[in-house]
UniProtKB/Swiss-Prot annotation:
Recorded name of the encoding gene: addA
EC id: 3.1.-.-, 5.6.2.4
Protein name as it appears in the record: ATP-dependent helicase/nuclease subunit A
Self-association and partners: Heterodimer of AddA and AddB/RexB.
Domain UvrD-like helicase ATP-binding: 27-483
Function according to Swiss-Prot or TrEMBL: The heterodimer acts as both an ATP-dependent DNA helicase and an ATP-dependent, dual-direction single-stranded exonuclease. Recognizes the chi site generating a DNA molecule suitable for the initiation of homologous recombination. The AddA nuclease domain is required for chi fragment generation; this subunit has the helicase and 3' -> 5' nuclease activities.
Family label: Belongs to the helicase family. AddA subfamily.
Length: 1222
């Protein structure tokens, strides 16, 4: 029950419906099932929306409508009297929070429009107003709010800032590390500390490897709920626990025995094959068969009788026996086909080999680990102290402060627990332990609502732990009194072709060992509607593999990259889809594992005329080719004797020297000089005094003269002109800006070059002058392995999308191509010199001196790197965790598709059959096999081979070179939009340079004189708008767009034609109509025509007004309905006047204008402005009018002393009315 006050000051009582009982929920489920609608809520969705009074874990499979469930549940809570500000709603990203808030807002608007009860309308309106202050956001954002409010309780100032710049963090870390390192090198235990540093860095002078170890340990500890306690209690956990053979975990012994038994079974399967050859021609057992039978029998016996024959104490003896029993190779060959029978067992033996020796030396490294523990603890405390002094923190610091506040202050914790009706979290599978602790502190123990899908947990690199979700899942299933598990299995996104192949693949791949969850019936995808089950034979999934048997070297030298042939396969399929089936490009998406090494995709697509839009990629502005060329040009101007920069400039398109030219120049060495730089050789070559002047032919001599003349002019200009002007001079002199316009990614390249000039200009304006300082600044950024922000260009809307699998999460696309399926999973972390684990702590490779063990007397030491037992345990867990993450990545990628999924890879057709024999295997691929296969492609081929008798819902097809000829691939059926010859006289760089020179001069003149001379006493927002709109966007995109526009048309006017109605007249007429339109009546065509007669405009203007669009605004948009619902609060065409201070002249002036519409409520104002401008994207007008609406808001706030909480643009210049919140 809720009390409000009416206009007379009388209390209004709102009675809310109670929460549904389990019986009422069942009744609702039955009613929904009987409804005659194609799209119904599932029983599980209804249960997730309406169940209350207990902890709830919703396991929502891909495309099951989890966001719909969350929004509906929130709305149901509000309708039952729970205010939106009493819900804690955590999202994984800021973008997700914004989208969720918008969905709730739209739902509230819709509910207000449907509600006839006045009291309920008032209540829902209040919820709408409270929405912007509600706790809907990331855990980081909430933690900041807690620390800002209660930081004083733990001695933290509320006036802190977030250190988001990695470069700033690195500088502070380096300062702390260096100081601490010197202290430890001079302490009492310095010899042990030196041994520690040498164990990782080789010597005490190069500390980079040791520094990386410390930083990694620190970062890892920050993801735990209490870093200090973890470092003190868990960091050396495994080192203290696993010191004897008896300490080895039973699970690891079981895995070894399982590998032995699997090897015996696989070997038996191979020996039973028809072509194996068990008998000789004489009819007796062959020697090979006898040997293999012995291996099978002994392995089986040792597994069965392990405890009595060996036990843990005899594990080292077992390892020696098995090593001596099996052959050193991995394969058994039958009929020229190799079966890797012993591969997995060899890997296991390697893990346990020399255990006694390792354990003997492992004791020696414990003192090193204690020193490391002390150093990391000291580093953590010192680094935090520096950040406290600077009042600048990282996100993890803020989260730990929030945890500390809630743990140490019972009253604060209880106030939050009492305030929040429910603690809701989205993407729960991606939480880490720090976030889980914070959620636990906010909850009262029985009011948590968690939504996620462990099969989509793909953020382990951010220390996300899917086992948090998994443990809750198991606990709630075993003990229902702790919480309820609800499974959302129905998929409403994909056709059956996608669902079937996903189920087929993961039912053979995913279980608790690899994937962290058994992909059984409760996790399989089910079509949510009948329409999804309609079969389409041409949408069957395909694994398309380029046959590399005759690979001509088209693949990049880097095996991680995708080959030209693979991309050509994709281009061929896209052309077929577009030409034959009319599939628009924007319906097609390419998914890749990483943002790097994808240039070949853009280049190949450009050749075939396929438009492509990328997701931006990682920050690599300084690594883009055109920027690197310009930076080397500037380095050469600064110091021509920098050979690396000089060679790069000579080889660049500006001068186009080839390898032969450079070789001839290199031979002009002066034999009397020991060190001779390339610049000196060029000068000698020009005057004919080199060691081999006969090699410098006339053409080369001419190129050298041009180069030296140009370089001389640049170096002279660099001393006199600005860096900004120098860059534009380079563009003009060598046509480089124009050259990149003819290359792939022309817009991006030109924007990058333009941004370089602007950044140089900003650098000099900040007080740093000179080319040398600019180069040093850039080099410093590169040295810290950082980069400058990438320049964004407007991506084409009608284009194929290219993005990473991580970026695609939560999205859906009709056609999905999963590229580079032959790329090996990154196993870099499991080969490092140390591995961290939350339970076990740290495991290291120890550099042991085994001189005594070998009895060596001549050498000072014999160093051997040993994998300690903790390291081996952590390594095995990390390997399985990595494979599990990759498996979940494949799941995410496949379930993005709505209609069809393609797998693209490369393999040798002749070698692709080398998989284990399909006999005697269960539903899953053997664990040993899943562990040894390290690509998506290997998994799919293994499934296709071993389970070939099943319908796996995907086909494997090898593509030959003959399938990828120009004729076979085909061409897009699109007209040529632009004749390149039309641009032959268009020198963009000159035009831009002249424009920028003019703008610079005008800007300087304005800054010096115009403020004082031309300041008017009265201004309008439209006049001020021009001062806020940049003449040229910083990234240069607008210039590029304008340069491609056609020249002005000077066609003579046709006087017989009627004059065109001015856009400004249409805008004025619209404003008049919106002012006089009676909102108390239903808005339809007749109402609009009646109102139109009363405005002061000629008939041509009235006829030009699109009344259907205006009607659509009021009838089809929530804002239009808001106009009608709250017409008593509405003010239209309201004039205003306020005093403003000119920022330059410091003179006051009057700002006058007219506000189209605003709603005045008791505690806030909503502002609305109509625009009839033509536009391509709404964001254009949002940027254009943002400052104008801020002026309107300022005027309203000054007048009413109330905040303007919402500002809307009503865009009438498109095909339909669009509402944009500013």
């Amino acid at each position: 029950m809720l009390f409000n006050i009416n206009e007379k000051g009388e209390p209004l009582v709102i009675s809310f419906a109670p929460f549904l009982s389990p019986e009422a929920i069942k009744h609702l489920q039955e009613n929904e099932r009987c409804r005659d609608q194609s799209q119904k809520r599932t029983a599980q969705q209804i249960e997730a929306i309406y169940t209350s009074g207990q902890n709830i874990l919703v396991s929502a499979s891909a495309g099951s409508g989890k966001t719909f469930v969350m929004v509906e549940r929130i709305l149901d809570k509000i309708l039952r009297g729970v205010s939106i500000d009493r819900l804690f709603i955590s999202t994984f990203t800021v973008k997700a929070a914004t989208e969720l808030r918008e969905r709730i807002e739209n739902k509230l608007y819709s509910q207000i429009a449907q509600t006839t009860d006045f009291q309920m309308k008032v209540y829902l309106t209040e919820q709408l107003q409270s929405l912007c202050q509600a706790d809907i956001g990331t855990m980081d954002a909430f933690a900041q709010k807690v620390v800002s409010r209660y930081g004083y309780s733990i001695g933290i100032s509320s006036q802190f800032r977030i250190m988001q710049d990695k470069a700033e963090q690195d500088v502070l870390k380096q300062e702390v590390f260096s100081k601490l390192f010197n202290e430890f090198m001079n302490q009492k235990e310095a010899p042990v500390f030196r041994a520690l540093v040498k164990n990782f860095s080789g010597n005490c002078k190069d500390t980079s490897a040791f520094r990386e170890l410390v930083y990694t340990c620190y970062s890892f500890s920050q993801s735990t709920e209490n870093p200090k306690i973890w470092l003190q209690e868990n960091f050396l956990s495994a080192a203290k626990t696993y010191q004897r053979l008896e300490d080895i975990p039973d699970h690891d012994i079981e895995l070894l025995l399982l590998a032995m038994q699997d090897t015996a079974n696989q070997l038996r399967d191979v020996t039973d094959m028809e072509d194996y050859g068990q008998l000789t021609k004489a009819g007796s057992r062959s020697a090979k068969y006898t040997k293999h039978l012995t291996i099978i029998e002994k392995l089986s016996d040792w597994v069965r009788d392990f405890k009595c024959l060996y036990g843990k104490a005899g594990l080292d003896r077992l390892i020696r026996d098995v090593t001596g029993l099996i052959p050193s190779g991995n394969d058994v060959t039958v009929s020229k086909v190799k079966y890797p029978v012993f591969k997995t067992l060899h890997q296991k033996l390697k893990q346990f080999r020399h255990l006694e020796t390792i354990l003997m030396y492992q004791k020696d490294c414990f003192s090193l680990l204690e020193q490391l523990q002390d150093f990391v603890l000291a580093f953590s405390e010192a680094y935090l102290a520096v950040k406290i002094q600077e009042s600048a923190f990282e996100f993890s610091d803020i989260a730990h402060f929030a945890i500390k506040i809630l743990e140490e202050n019972t009253d604060i914790r209880q106030s939050y627990q009492q305030h929040y009706h429910e603690v809701m979290v989205d993407e729960y599978q991606d939480n880490n332990h720090m976030q889980e602790r914070l959620l636990t502190l906010l909850s009262n123990g029985h009011n948590r609502f968690m939504v996620g899908d462990i099969k989509q947990s793909i953020y382990r690199f951010r220390q996300a732990d899917p086992q948090i979700f998994n443990q809750k899942f198991r606990d709630y299933q075993k003990k229902p009194e702790q919480g309820k598990v609800i499974l959302l299995k129905e998929n409403f996104r994909s056709q059956s072709e996608v669902l079937n192949v996903s189920n087929a693949v993961f039912s053979h791949l995913m279980d608790e060992s690899v994937g962290d969850v058994l992909y059984d019936e409760q996790h399989q995808l089910i079509a949510g509607s009948h329409a999804q089950t309609v079969p389409y034979l041409d949408r069957r999934a395909q694994l398309l593999l380029y046959n590399s048997d005759k690979d001509d070297g088209n693949a990049p030298s880097d095996s991680e990259g995708i080959s030209f042939s693979e991309v050509t396969i994709v281009a061929k399929e896209i052309i077929k889809l577009h030409n034959d089936k009319g599939v628009p490009f924007e319906d097609i998406t390419l998914l890749v594992s990483s943002r790097t090494r994808n240039d070949i995709i853009s280049h190949t697509f450009n050749q075939y005329g396929i438009p492509i839009a990328t997701d931006g990629g990682q920050q690599n502005y300084l690594k883009s080719v055109e920027v690197m060329v310009m930076l080397d040009t500037l380095r050469t101007i600064n110091n021509p004797r920098n050979d690396y920069a000089l060679v790069a400039l000579l080889r660049s398109p500006m001068f186009a020297f080839d390898e032969d030219d450079l070789a001839r120049i290199a031979l002009q060495k002066d034999n009397e000089l020991d060190k001779d730089c390339l610049y000196d050789k060029i000068q000698r070559a020009v005057i004919g005094r080199g060691a081999h002047p006969e090699l410098i032919h006339d053409t080369l001599l001419g190129k050298l003269n041009v180069f030296l003349k140009t370089l001389k002019s640049w170096r002279r200009y660099a001393k006199l002109g600005s860096l900004y002007d120098l860059i534009w001079k380079i563009f003009n002199d060598r046509f480089y800006f124009d050259f990149v316009a003819s290359q792939a990614k022309a817009e991006q390249a030109q924007a990058n070059l333009y941004a370089l000039a602007l950044r140089a200009n900003q650098f000099e304006k900040s007080g740093y002058k000179g080319l040398y300082r600019f180069i040093k600044m850039i080099d410093k950024v590169l040295e810290t392995q950082n980069d400058l922000a990438d320049v964004e260009v407007a991506t084409p809307k009608q284009a194929v999308n290219l993005m990473t699998i991580h970026k695609s999460k939560g999205l859906q696309f009709p056609y999905v191509f999963i590229l580079n399926c032959d790329k090996r999973f990154s196993m870099t972390d499991i080969h490092k010199s140390f591995i961290l684990n939350r339970q076990h702590g740290i495991g290291i490779k120890y550099l042991a001196d085994i001189k005594g063990l070998l009895g060596e007397t001549t050498l000072n030491s014999v160093k051997v790197s040993m994998e300690t037992l903790p390291y081996q345990l952590n390594k095995q867990e990390l390997r399985l965790a990595t494979l599990s993450e990759e498996m979940r990545l494949l799941y995410v990628a496949m379930t993005r598709a709505e209609k069809k999924v393609y797998f693209i890879g490369k393999a040798s057709k002749s070698k692709s059959q080398e998989i284990t024999d399909p006999k005697k295997l269960g539903k899953l691929l053997p664990l040993a096999l899943r562990e040894q296969l390290l690509t998506f492609q290997d998994w799919l081929l293994a499934i296709a081979d071993i389970f070939s008798t099943e319908d796996l819902y995907f086909d494997v097809r090898f593509i030959e070179d003959s399938d990828l000829t120009q004729e076979s691939v085909g061409r897009l059926q699109t007209p040529q939009l632009l004749n390149p010859d039309d641009l032959k006289d268009n020198r963009q760089s000159e035009t831009i340079a002249r424009a920028l020179d003019m703008l610079e001069a005008v800007s300087q003149l304005n800054a010096n004189y115009e403020a004082a001379i031309h300041l008017p006493t009265v201004r309008t927002p439209s006049q001020l708008k021009a001062t806020y709109e940049p003449l040229l966007e910083p990234i240069g995109v607008d210039i590029i767009e304008k340069s491609s526009r056609s020249l002005s048309d000077f066609t003579l006017p046709h006087f017989s034609k009627k004059a065109k109605v001015e856009a400004s007249h249409i805008g004025s007429a619209l404003h008049q109509l919106m002012q006089v339109l009676p909102l108390s009546k239903p808005i339809n065509q007749q109402t609009l025509l009646d109102a139109l007669r009363g405005i002061d405009s000629n008939e041509e203007v009235k006829t030009a007004l699109d009344l259907k669009k205006i009607e659509s605004f009021f009838c089809d948009t929530s804002l239009g309905q808001f106009f009608q619902t709250y017409q008593k609060h509405l003010y239209r065409e309201a004039p205003f006047a306020i005093l403003k201070l000119d920022p330059i002249s410091q003179e006051e002036y009057v700002l006058r204008g007219i506000i189209d519409a605003y709603f005045l409520f008791d505690d806030h104002i909503v502002l609305v402005d109509y625009k009839t401008d033509k536009y391509k994207q709404p964001i254009e007008l949002k940027k254009r009018y943002q400052q104008q609406l801020e002026l309107y808001a300022e005027a309203l706030t000054q007048t009413y002393k109330l905040p303007v909480t919402k500002r809307y643009l009503v865009l009438m210049g498109g095909g339909k009315p669009e509402i944009v919140e500013v």
